[in-house]
Amino acid sequence: MSTDLRTHVLSEHHVSRETAASLDLYVAQLTRWQTVKNLVGPATLKEVWHRHIADALQLLTVAPEATRWLDLGSGAGIPGLILALAGKERPGFHVGLVESNARKCAFLSETARLTGAPVTVHNARIEAVIGTLTDTEIVCARALAPLSQLLAWTEPLLTSGTIGLFPKGRDAATELTEAEDEWTFTRDLIPSRTDSQARIVRVTSLSRVDP
């Protein structure tokens, strides 16, 4: 891990000393659990501050006022657990983490306990719990599914005022075109701060295309 890269990420996102300590603990936990549970791509662990932490933190710059977040398919806690650590000093900040894999949920729960992250871990399939989480302001998911599937899962939220933030790679335009065959929505493509070819797809006002 590059100390210079860590310092750059913390400075760019104005991370407090206390939050930096929590993120360091998260990285230590991720490294320890990676040896027994493949939480992230092994090559990306060497670039964790850029590939994962900075990539997650940039979502806060897109929705700086939001305090009620939901992360689908949380896995290693990216971006949800990282967002919770960055926001835990803010009153009322909370992130729901939805993950169907029990061992990944064990990682999320233990790391949240050690870091004091303001999260609720939902060990369940998305479709089983999404309808009960309608107080969500922002729903996000990274590297989980094509956009059309994400919209299908989040329909109960995005039709009721919740904003979707979905980081996508170079296929973002293709996924948007495919999604527009089934859905009508307002969208913005926000350039990623960590990958010049990636975009954050911001979705609001979702409805199904009339048959």
Swiss-Prot record:
Signal peptide: none annotated. It catalyses: guanosine(527) in 16S rRNA + S-adenosyl-L-methionine = N(7)-methylguanosine(527) in 16S rRNA + S-adenosyl-L-homocysteine. Keywords: Cytoplasm, Methyltransferase, rRNA processing, S-adenosyl-L-methionine, Transferase. GO terms for cellular component: cytosol. Transmembrane segments: none annotated. SUPFAM superfamilies: S-adenosyl-L-methionine-dependent methyltransferases. Its main location: cytoplasm. S-adenosyl-L-methionine binds at residues 73, 126-127, 142. It is found in: Cytoplasm. InterPro entries: rRNA_ssu_MeTfrase_G, SAM-dependent_MTases_sf. GO terms for molecular function: rRNA (guanine-N7-)-methyltransferase activity. Its EC number is 2.1.1.170. Specifically methylates the N7 position of guanine in position 527 of 16S rRNA. Belongs to the methyltransferase superfamily. RNA methyltransferase RsmG family. NCBIfam families: rsmG_gidB. This is Ribosomal RNA small subunit methyltransferase G. The gene is rsmG.
